[in-house]
Regions:
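Short, structured coil segments at secondary-structure junctions
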Residues: 55-56, 64, 159-163, 216-217, ...
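Conserved acidic, metal-coordinating active-site core of Asp-based
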Residues: 95-204, 208-216, 225
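Active-site phosphate-binding/coordination module
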Residues: 16, 21-115
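Active-site metal-binding loops of divalent metal-dependent hydrolases
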Residues: 11, 43, 205-207
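Asp-based, Mg2+/Mn2+-dependent phosphohydrolase catalytic module
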Residues: 216, 221-259
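Asp-based phosphoryl-transfer active-site loop
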Residues: 2-17
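Residue-level signal for inorganic ion chemistry
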Residues: 30, 41, 144, 214, ...
Length: 259
């Protein structure tokens, strides 16, 4: 019996600002049947708040699993050590890189004029971050995007790469999370809190940062627009986002399992 359904956001529930009406209907049907919907995303709580409120979803696992929020309030967080962020800011300042830092209430950027950040804005769409001046201390940070190449990335992670969860999503941009946190780890913590077993959960995704997530639950579902690597690991492959993939999977594989 499925008791919880976790949804990646970009490429799964929505494509930029477009979200199919069928996805809204599917989430509403899950709630009507007592199944807990959860957003599970690499974005910050700050960024996904409008979507969470629009869909009436209480729980969100954000920052690729490093932050868990309930109705926008931090319930659990796994932040970077302050010294790590301090060192990375010094490296970025010296090398001319830009850091996008995810806090619980806001996002912060070290250089707003960075061309890579501006390209990411055009391609993906970030909510506007607050500028963080070199002399300002950063708050608790749950995820860091570094706009740099793969070789330059090693200046930040050094010999301690195993301490971080690293997801490179462009040749010039990489997500880094503390203590090996990923979406699966964050969802597992939430499942424990709600006393739901992994086999009683479903998860939807389309990207490589959803790989651990869909393998960690009883019903892992890859979107039709996902890559082959994710599809090979999924229990089911649904239709694409633009072809009502969420509703199709909910009606075919989740609601029948919740009876």
């Amino acid at each position: 019996m499925i008791k919880l359904a976790a949804f990646d956001v970009d490429g799964t529930l929505r494509d930029r600002e477009y979200m199919p009406e069928s996805a809204r209907r599917a989430v509403a049907r899950l709630k009507a049947r007592g199944i807990v919907p959860v957003l599970c995303t690499g974005r910050s709580e700050y960024e996904i708040r409008p979507l969470r409120e629009e869909l009436g979803i209480d729980w969100a696992v954000t920052c690729n699993g490093s932050h868990i929020g309930f109705c926008g309030r931090t319930e659990s967080g796994n932040a970077f050590a302050e010294e790590t962020i301090r060192e990375w800011r010094q490296i970025a300042e010296r090398r001319g890189h830009t850091l996008l830092l995810y806090g619980s209430e806001n996002m912060y950027i070290t250089r707003q004029a960075d061309p890579y950040f501006q390209q990411a804005q055009r391609e993906i769409g970030f909510m506007e971050p607050l500028p963080l001046n070199p002399e300002e201390e950063a708050p608790a940070i749950y995820q860091c995007i570094i706009f740099c190449g793969e070789e330059e990335e090693r200046e930040y992670t050094g010999k301690n790469r195993q301490k971080f969860y690293i997801h490179r999503w462009r040749t010039w941009a990489v997500d880094i999370n503390p203590n090996g946190r990923n979406k699966a780890e964050g969802l597992r913590e939430l499942l424990d809190r709600l006393e739901i077993r992994p086999e009683e959960a479903a998860a939807f995704g389309d990207g490589l940062n959803d790989l651990e997530l869909i393998e960690s639950v009883g019903t892992g579902i890859a979107m039709g627009n996902a890559g082959d690597e994710l599809k090979e690991k999924a229990r089911y492959v649904t239709r694409s986002l633009h072809d009502d993939g969420i509703e199709y999977a909910v009606d075919r594989w989740i609601l029948p399992e919740s009876r």
